Amino acid sequence: MADFQSIAQQFVTFYYQTFDGNRAGLAPLYRDHSMLTFETSAIQGVAGIIEKLTSLPFQKVQHQVSTLDAQPSGEHGGILVLVTGALLVDEEKNPMNYTQTFQLMPDGAGSYFVLNDVFRLIYNA
Protein backbone atom coordinates (compact mmCIF):
# COMPACT_ATOMS: atom_id res chain seq x y z
CA MET A 1 0.00 0.00 0.00
CA ALA A 2 1.28 3.44 -0.93
CA ASP A 3 2.04 5.87 1.87
CA PHE A 4 -1.29 7.71 2.07
CA GLN A 5 0.15 10.52 4.24
CA SER A 6 2.91 11.22 1.72
CA ILE A 7 0.47 11.14 -1.19
CA ALA A 8 -1.86 13.54 0.65
CA GLN A 9 1.03 15.94 1.38
CA GLN A 10 2.20 15.91 -2.24
CA PHE A 11 -1.36 16.43 -3.47
CA VAL A 12 -2.06 19.35 -1.12
CA THR A 13 1.22 21.08 -2.03
CA PHE A 14 0.49 20.72 -5.74
CA TYR A 15 -3.18 21.70 -5.40
CA TYR A 16 -2.58 24.97 -3.55
CA GLN A 17 0.46 25.98 -5.63
CA THR A 18 -1.64 25.47 -8.76
CA PHE A 19 -4.72 27.15 -7.27
CA ASP A 20 -2.68 30.18 -6.23
CA GLY A 21 -0.97 30.51 -9.62
CA ASN A 22 -3.34 29.15 -12.28
CA ARG A 23 -6.73 27.85 -11.14
CA ALA A 24 -7.58 26.52 -14.61
CA GLY A 25 -4.57 24.22 -14.22
CA LEU A 26 -6.53 22.20 -11.65
CA ALA A 27 -8.76 20.67 -14.36
CA PRO A 28 -6.74 17.43 -14.71
CA LEU A 29 -7.34 16.69 -11.01
CA TYR A 30 -11.12 16.35 -11.50
CA ARG A 31 -13.39 14.01 -13.49
CA ASP A 32 -16.89 14.42 -14.90
CA HIS A 33 -18.34 12.68 -11.83
CA SER A 34 -16.29 14.78 -9.38
CA MET A 35 -18.18 17.14 -7.08
CA LEU A 36 -17.16 20.44 -5.49
CA THR A 37 -19.06 22.12 -2.69
CA PHE A 38 -17.70 25.66 -2.35
CA GLU A 39 -19.39 27.42 0.56
CA THR A 40 -23.06 26.88 -0.41
CA SER A 41 -22.61 26.04 -4.11
CA ALA A 42 -22.50 22.41 -5.22
CA ILE A 43 -21.04 21.78 -8.69
CA GLN A 44 -20.47 18.50 -10.52
CA GLY A 45 -18.11 17.86 -13.42
CA VAL A 46 -14.78 19.24 -14.56
CA ALA A 47 -16.13 22.14 -16.64
CA GLY A 48 -18.44 23.43 -13.91
CA ILE A 49 -15.83 23.07 -11.19
CA ILE A 50 -13.16 24.94 -13.15
CA GLU A 51 -15.69 27.62 -14.16
CA LYS A 52 -16.51 28.14 -10.47
CA LEU A 53 -12.86 28.26 -9.38
CA THR A 54 -11.77 30.64 -12.15
CA SER A 55 -14.72 32.98 -11.57
CA LEU A 56 -14.03 33.56 -7.87
CA PRO A 57 -13.99 37.32 -7.15
CA PHE A 58 -10.28 37.82 -6.52
CA GLN A 59 -7.16 38.08 -8.64
CA LYS A 60 -4.45 37.00 -6.20
CA VAL A 61 -4.71 34.31 -3.54
CA GLN A 62 -2.20 32.71 -1.21
CA HIS A 63 -3.04 29.61 0.84
CA GLN A 64 -1.18 28.89 4.06
CA VAL A 65 -1.79 25.31 5.24
CA SER A 66 -1.93 24.93 9.03
CA THR A 67 -2.89 21.27 9.38
CA LEU A 68 -3.21 18.29 7.09
CA ASP A 69 -4.79 15.01 8.18
CA ALA A 70 -5.19 11.96 5.95
CA GLN A 71 -6.72 8.50 6.22
CA PRO A 72 -7.01 5.58 3.84
CA SER A 73 -10.63 5.45 2.68
CA GLY A 74 -12.61 2.52 1.33
CA GLU A 75 -11.53 -0.69 -0.30
CA HIS A 76 -10.58 0.90 -3.62
CA GLY A 77 -7.51 2.77 -2.36
CA GLY A 78 -9.08 6.16 -1.71
CA ILE A 79 -7.56 8.78 0.58
CA LEU A 80 -9.57 11.21 2.72
CA VAL A 81 -7.71 14.50 3.25
CA LEU A 82 -8.69 17.28 5.69
CA VAL A 83 -6.87 20.62 5.47
CA THR A 84 -7.17 23.70 7.67
CA GLY A 85 -5.39 26.94 7.00
CA ALA A 86 -5.59 30.61 6.17
CA LEU A 87 -5.75 32.45 2.88
CA LEU A 88 -4.99 35.96 1.75
CA VAL A 89 -6.77 37.44 -1.25
CA ASP A 90 -5.73 40.42 -3.35
CA GLU A 91 -4.39 43.20 -1.10
CA GLU A 92 -6.19 42.03 2.05
CA LYS A 93 -3.96 42.10 5.14
CA ASN A 94 -6.11 39.89 7.39
CA PRO A 95 -6.09 36.21 6.43
CA MET A 96 -9.36 34.25 6.33
CA ASN A 97 -9.44 30.82 7.96
CA TYR A 98 -10.71 27.88 5.93
CA THR A 99 -11.18 24.14 5.96
CA GLN A 100 -11.14 21.91 2.90
CA THR A 101 -11.77 18.19 2.56
CA PHE A 102 -10.75 16.08 -0.44
CA GLN A 103 -11.70 12.51 -1.29
CA LEU A 104 -8.91 11.28 -3.55
CA MET A 105 -9.36 8.14 -5.65
CA PRO A 106 -6.80 6.19 -7.69
CA ASP A 107 -7.15 6.84 -11.42
CA GLY A 108 -5.87 3.45 -12.52
CA ALA A 109 -2.72 4.96 -14.01
CA GLY A 110 -0.73 5.30 -10.79
CA SER A 111 -2.07 8.71 -9.81
CA TYR A 112 -5.13 10.11 -8.02
CA PHE A 113 -8.08 12.33 -8.90
CA VAL A 114 -10.44 14.40 -6.74
CA LEU A 115 -13.80 12.67 -6.39
CA ASN A 116 -15.12 15.06 -3.73
CA ASP A 117 -13.94 18.52 -2.68
CA VAL A 118 -15.63 20.52 0.10
CA PHE A 119 -14.40 24.06 0.89
CA ARG A 120 -15.67 26.30 3.67
CA LEU A 121 -14.46 29.60 5.11
CA ILE A 122 -14.49 29.69 8.91
CA TYR A 123 -16.02 32.88 10.24
CA ASN A 124 -15.38 34.13 13.77
CA ALA A 125 -18.47 33.96 15.97
Swiss-Prot record:
Gene3D superfamilies: 3.10.450.50
GO annotation terms (biological process): protein import into nucleus
Keywords, ordered alphabetically: Cytoplasm, Protein transport, Transport
Pfam families referenced in this protein's UniProt entry, alphabetically: NTF2
InterPro entries tied to this protein: NTF2, NTF2-like_dom_sf, NTF2_dom, Nuclear_transport_factor_2_euk
Domain NTF2: 7-121
Localization, UniProt: Cytoplasm
Molecular function terms from GO: nuclear import signal receptor activity
One CC-aspect GO term: cytoplasm
Function as written in the Swiss-Prot or TrEMBL entry: Facilitates protein transport into the nucleus. Could be part of a multicomponent system of cytosolic factors that assemble at the pore complex during nuclear import.
Protein name: Nuclear transport factor 2
Annotated organism of origin: Emericella nidulans (strain FGSC A4 / ATCC 38163 / CBS 112.46 / NRRL 194 / M139) (Aspergillus nidulans)
The organism's taxonomic lineage, starting at the top: Eukaryota, Fungi, Dikarya, Ascomycota, Pezizomycotina
